[in-house]
Amino acid sequence: MSKKQTTAAATAPIDILELHTQIQQFIETESKNVVVLEAKLVKINQLLECDYLRPRIIYRLKMEKEMCEKLIIEHHNLDFFNIDVAHLIEEYHMLNRTEIVLPFFSPTKDQLTQQLEHKRKKMDLEKQFLNKLKNYTHLKNFEFMMKHCEFIPKSSPPPCVCGNKTEFIKDDDRAVCAICCTEQSLISNTSSFSDVGRVNMASKYTYNRKVHFRDCITQYQGKQKTHIPEEIYTILETKLLEKNLLNTEPGLTVEKRYEKVTRAMVLDILKELGSKDVKKFYDDIVLIHHTLTKQPCDNIEYLEDSLLDDFDKLTETYDNLYVNQDSPDDERGGTKRKNFINAQFVLYQLLRKHNHPCNSMDFLTLKKSERKRFHHTICKKLFSILEWKYSYSIC
């Protein structure tokens, strides 16, 4: 099949007008949040003008101020979004008003070609619209949500009675031979934006896994927008002093004062407290440690796309081996199970696969040795199938 026909056959429709409406609703909601952030920023600036604040409190306030300012700037950038996509929306509306309707019986080749060209123009606008989302940090979730709606191949028609096997002009639900104009039914596997709310449970689990893994990547770099109560830092500082883990010489910088403090130490202290209110911050340990000690977080931004691609492959292999089975055990040695492997366990293994240096102690993995061995067994098998390098060195 020529490149021309392949392009037409390999793209699925996306209703960017509905997506645009969803984005407008999101921007309206965010506008209310910005009012709250601006009020918070005023209070922070007032506090910073006070005298005799402890250095750690000043540092914390400056961090909060920086985060608020960043979020406000990112929101104000959304003011340019409507201007940026206005011409695309207008062209899309015009194409909708000039929709090509084929006669029910025996459409001519010219009519089919006109309809195909019309669809190509719409799909080109859809791609341009989705590419615009990449320029706006606040709209990344919309870009991620729509990825699965693009480039979904349709079923290929059987050979035509005239002998043609490749030259077809395809519509949503039919294919017409470009040589003799014979029409065939075509089962379409496309999805639209409205289909997002009607995905089956398997797709829901897959989506939730990936969202959870993305959160894990964000938390590992300490980039999540989570508010950590000031009491947490006060408790940590008190406990670290009790354990003689702080350098108490006068005049030291924050980095020097906390240079002996590791993430594992901070996590151990939080666990010692045994409080349910504290337990919910375990996943934020990197952010807490960085804010407290000013020690830098690991930056894996350059690997994020590769990690997400690897995760997709790993998930698909896992489902084929352990979930999508008719019988409890099959010839590949899989055992049907529902739960996926620990996200931080997976992140560590994928970072090691890409030869990224990282400390296994920085990952919240599994408590019991039996569970660790079980995860190693599963993960090693998946990596072996995918022919990836596997590492055992994780706590």
UniProtKB/Swiss-Prot annotation:
<keyword id="KW-0805">Transcription regulation</keyword>
<dbReference type="InterPro" id="IPR007031">
    <property type="entry name" value="Poxvirus_VLTF3"/>
</dbReference>
<dbReference type="GO" id="GO:0046782">
    <property type="term" value="P:regulation of viral transcription"/>
</dbReference>
<comment type="function">
    <text>Transcription activation.</text>
</comment>
<comment type="similarity">
    <text>Belongs to the IIV-6 282R family.</text>
</comment>
<keyword id="KW-0010">Activator</keyword>
<protein>
    <recommendedName>
        <fullName>Putative transcription factor 079L</fullName>
    </recommendedName>
</protein>
<keyword id="KW-0804">Transcription</keyword>
<dbReference type="Pfam" id="PF04947">
    <property type="entry name" value="Pox_VLTF3"/>
</dbReference>
